[in-house]
Regions:
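Signature of N6-adenine DNA methyltransferases within the class I
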Residues: 1-155, 174, 184-194, 203, ...
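Short secondary-structure junctions and interdomain/linker hinges
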Residues: 37, 125-133, 152-157, 166-170, ...
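Long, contiguous hydrophobic alpha-helical segments, chiefly transmembrane helices and signal peptides
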Residues: 39, 55, 146, 179-181, ...
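Non-catalytic DNA-recognition/assembly elements of restriction-modification systems
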Residues: 107-115, 119-122, 141-142, 276-388
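DNA target-recognition domains and sequence-specific DNA-contacting regions of bacterial/archaeal
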Residues: 136-223, 232-237, 360-388
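N-proximal short alpha-helices
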Residues: 214, 218, 257-258, 318-322, ...
Length: 388
């Protein structure tokens, strides 16, 4: 509004302008009325202790929507001197896009690093065509209505499993809590607008932790589990199983798209339902995911924090040394199998989406370790003493 027709607007603002969902309307307005000539993403540190900045030049002209502006990225460098040197050398990463290309992306984010191949998948075959949000349950008094599962008897119908997000862990686990599910408690939740819709009770789903400072990780939700707002959950519209989507979202390709769709530390249901879905080699993927679930469930159930823990693994031998050797071998086998499966899933989805050279199939060992742990003498001895 401050610029005449064919005039230029040159500004430096916080980088959140390019990505935050709350500024979608502003980005759409710019897409409809302007073209971007140049953009320099300065990242953190250009102006001291800032929150990240971008400098840009817009021109108010509506007749050149296909004009491809230039985007420079200086975010990898920290100091002002390094940024200046990199900018003047013109050796920083450079990308070219027209603003109207961003209309295809959820929230119209200016995700300028996205390749043309990735752009092709947005705007069609969204996950929302087959999946729906399950809402959330809110007790309005967690201190009263929630317990860690080992604090209550496992034969009580009053308490049922409750999802509350948790640490990074793929496929299965993070089952710590139970919620009071008595009729009186449910009436209280409902009276405050917190009771989740009964049509979602008793169904398997796909869940994850809403907030993460690392990567999103998706897990199987058992049918008996209810879930809170920090453990968003989606279901197929016919409530059937769909391990293909879990495999896709947990893959490197899944992470590639989610980083475009979600630009904050919180991954909400709407963003996940905007995920572009391409199905290929479905049975092969399903078999791999089923095996991953079994591997990670065995890992989770080997520790006392699991509701299905039966016996400490160091008791399963003639001697403690023999038991530990066997346990160490089992853990190593599970770890290597999960790592192999996850890499194969990455390769399948990279091929399915045509993202060779853009997405890496390699699997980070610390990610596998979070879901299928190696034996660790110090930790396992402490656990054994605690169990005793």
């Amino acid at each position: 509004k401050m610029t005449h027709r064919l005039g230029y607007q040159v500004m430096i603002t916080q980088q959140s302008f390019y990505f935050l969902s709350g500024l979608e309307a502003l980005r759409k307005n710019i897409i409809m009325n302007d073209i971007l000539i140049n953009s320099v993403h300065l990242g953190l540190g250009a102006f001291g202790n800032d929150f990240g900045t971008v400098a840009f030049v817009f021109q108010k002209v509506m007749s050149c929507r296909e004009y491809r502006g230039r985007y420079l990225y200086l975010g990898e460098t920290k100091s002002v001197e390094e940024k200046e040197k990199l900018f003047l050398s013109q050796k920083c990463p450079q990308y070219y896009h027209s603003l109207y290309e961003f209309e295809k992306l959820p929230n119209c984010t200016y995700s300028y690093t996205v390749s043309s191949k990735t752009f092709e998948h947005f705007g069609k075959n969204c996950m929302s065509e087959q999946f729906m949000s399950g809402g959330r349950n809110k007790t309005h008094n967690d201190d009263k209505y929630l317990r860690l599962h080992w604090e209550v008897g496992n034969t009580s119908d009053k308490w049922i499993p409750y999802g509350k997000g948790g640490e990074f862990r793929k496929w299965y686990g993070n089952h710590y809590y139970v919620v009071n599910w008595s009729e009186t408690a449910r009436k209280f939740y409902a009276s405050h607008g917190g009771l989740c819709n009964s049509k979602f009770w008793g169904h398997e789903g796909l869940t994850w932790s809403f907030v993460t400072s690392y990567k999103p990780s998706f897990r199987f939700k058992p049918k008996e589990m209810i879930y809170s707002s920090v453990s968003p959950t989606v279901f197929r519209k016919d409530f059937s199983r769909d391990f293909y989507m879990m495999g896709l979202l947990n893959s490197n390709v899944g992470l590639h798209f989610l980083r475009i769709i979600s630009s904050t530390i919180g991954t909400n249901v709407g963003e996940v339902l905007n995920f572009p879905v391409v199905r290929n080699r479905v049975q092969e993927v399903t078999n791999l995911v089923e095996e991953n679930l079994l591997l990670c469930k065995k890992d989770w159930d080997s520790f006392e924090v699991s509701p299905e823990f039966l016996r400490h693994p160091l008791l399963l031998g003639k001697t403690t040394l023999e038991a530990y050797s066997s346990w160490e071998e089992q853990c190593s086998e599970r770890f290597e199998k999960l790592k192999k499966n996850e890499r194969l899933l990455n390769e399948i989805f990279i091929d399915t989406y045509g993202l060779q050279g853009e997405v890496n199939a390699e699997v980070e060992e610390r990610d596998v370790e979070a879901s299928c742990r190696h034996a660790e003498l110090h930790r396992d001895v402490k656990s054994f003493i605690s169990y005793a």
